[in-house]
Regions:
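A conserved ligand/cofactor-binding region detector
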Residues: 1-120
Length: 120
C-alpha cells in the first residue's frame, strides 16, 4: 500500500511539473491541464438568472471562447431554449444575437445562424 501511494504521488508530481513547463512555454492553462491525471478533477456549479445566462451565452458561445466551455454553454443554451424559448430565442454571441461581431478581436468566422451555432 505504501509503495502504491509513493507511485501515485510521484506520477502526480511529474504531471504537475510537466503542466507548469507547458504553461511556461505559453500553452494556455485550460489546454495544458489535459495532461493532468483525472484525479485533478474540475467541477463547475453555477447559479444564474436569465440576464446572467444571456451574458454567459454571449461570451462563452463565441468561437473565440475555449472549446470546452463553449460545448458546455451550447448544451446549456439548448436546455434553456427548451424551457424558455421566448426568453432565449436570441441568446448567443453577438454575431447571432445582433448580426455582427462586437469582439475586440473577431474570430473572422461568425456564425450565420442560431441553427449553425447549435449544430456545431
Amino acid at each position: 500500500l505504501e509503495e502504491a501511494r509513493q507511485i501515485f504521488e510521484r506520477s502526480c508530481e511529474e504531471a504537475h511539473k510537466a503542466y507548469l513547463a507547458l504553461c511556461d512555454l505559453g500553452v494556455p492553462r485550460e489546454d495544458a491541464r489535459y495532461l493532468l491525471p483525472h484525479g485533478f478533477e474540475t467541477s463547475l456549479v453555477v447559479t444564474m438568472n436569465a440576464r446572467e445566462l444571456m451574458h454567459f451565452f454571449r461570451l462563452r458561445l463565441c468561437r473565440r471562447a475555449q472549446w470546452e466551455i463553449r460545448d458546455v454553454a451550447r448544451e446549456m443554451l439548448r436546455q434553456a431554449r427548451e424551457k424558455a424559448p421566448y426568453i432565449f430565442a436570441l441568446a448567443g454571441p453577438s454575431c447571432v444575437s445582433k448580426g455582427s461581431c462586437e469582439e475586440e478581436k473577431p474570430c473572422g468566422k461568425p456564425y450565420g445562424s442560431m441553427e449553425e451555432l447549435l449544430e456545431e
